[in-house]
């Protein structure tokens, strides 16, 4: 299955970040399209306070200690590879699409320290933390082929332990692209995702404190093809006081982040503000799944 250039760029969570694509290409007055949330509060997990908070949240939800330690080793590898002034010192507030770094310069810094190894993206990171809350039937065999996962799989060949104990078969079952109807109706695409995951034997273990948040994109590589793919994904954690924390890897060569939100509406506004950046297209808008249901 061949993907068009736009799909490939988005599907990688881009080496330079989907956030870069989301921030360009608009001109004129699009104020009516702006999300309700225009500021975010986030940390790059480069300080002891936010790291301890995340460790506690993950442990409280039942994420195994081995997965937590594996995650933080890769956070440290990334943070140690880039300039410290590009990272937050604890939680900081910023405009929705603002970054403290130039993504091209950050990519150069990463490459200087890590060579051709691309690093870890949103999909690898989410699976590494969420894997114990996901089940895939033993006979699920997905051949990713020329799928959106080709750079992911190159990274996993170099570091197969990056999935935290999950298998490559599980990774493919969750993230491989799906054939879809040629429609802009979100309801029908949600049904496609649910049915395809079911056919692959993908099920989610119910836990209100930890959820997988997946942003699906619709693309038409050719006139005859229509597909859905995971353009971004992260892990949502709920603290005892109800505060929401969203853990993500922005892109292969962009930072880890933990964002703090008051409710799911704010989280949805954040994700759609970054990724729902097209207009007048003949494809469906991105949509957000919470585990295997459309996020409210």
Per-segment meaning from a language model:
Residues 24-296:
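Cysteine-nucleophile amide-bond enzymes
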Residues 1-11:
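Bacterial N-terminal signal peptides that target proteins for export
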């Amino acid at each position: 299955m061949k993907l068009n250039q736009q799909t490939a760029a988005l599907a990688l969570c881009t080496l330079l970040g989907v956030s870069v694509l989301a921030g360009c290409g608009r001109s004129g007055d699009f104020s009516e399209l702006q999300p309700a949330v225009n500021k975010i509060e986030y940390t790059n997990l480069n300080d002891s306070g936010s790291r301890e908070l995340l460790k506690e949240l993950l442990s409280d939800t039942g994420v195994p200690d081995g997965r937590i330690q594996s995650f933080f080793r890769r956070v440290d590898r990334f943070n140690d590879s880039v300039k410290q002034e590009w990272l937050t010192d604890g939680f900081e507030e910023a405009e929705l699409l603002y970054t403290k770094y130039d993504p091209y310069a950050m990519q150069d810094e990463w490459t200087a320290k890590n060579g051709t190894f691309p690093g870890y993206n949103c999909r690898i990171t989410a699976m590494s933390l969420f894997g114990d809350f996901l089940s895939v039937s033993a006979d699920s065999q997905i051949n990713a082929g020329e799928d959106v996962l080709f750079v992911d799989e190159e990274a996993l060949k170099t570091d197969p332990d990056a999935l935290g104990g999950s298998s490559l078969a599980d990774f493919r079952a969750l993230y491989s692209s799906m054939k879809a109807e040629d429609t802009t109706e979100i309801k029908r695409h949600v049904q496609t995702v649910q049915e395809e995951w079911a056919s692959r034997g993908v099920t989610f273990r119910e836990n209100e404190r930890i959820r997988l948040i997946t942003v699906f994109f619709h693309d038409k590589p050719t006139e005859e093809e229509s597909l859905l793919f995971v353009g971004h994904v992260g892990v949502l954690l709920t603290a005892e006081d109800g505060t929401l924390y969203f853990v993500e890897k922005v892109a292969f060569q962009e930072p880890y982040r933990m964002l703090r939100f008051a409710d799911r509406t704010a989280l949805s506004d954040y994700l759609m503000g970054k990724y729902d950046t097209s207009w007048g297209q003949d494809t469906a808008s991105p949509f957000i799944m919470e585990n295997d249901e459309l996020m409210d």
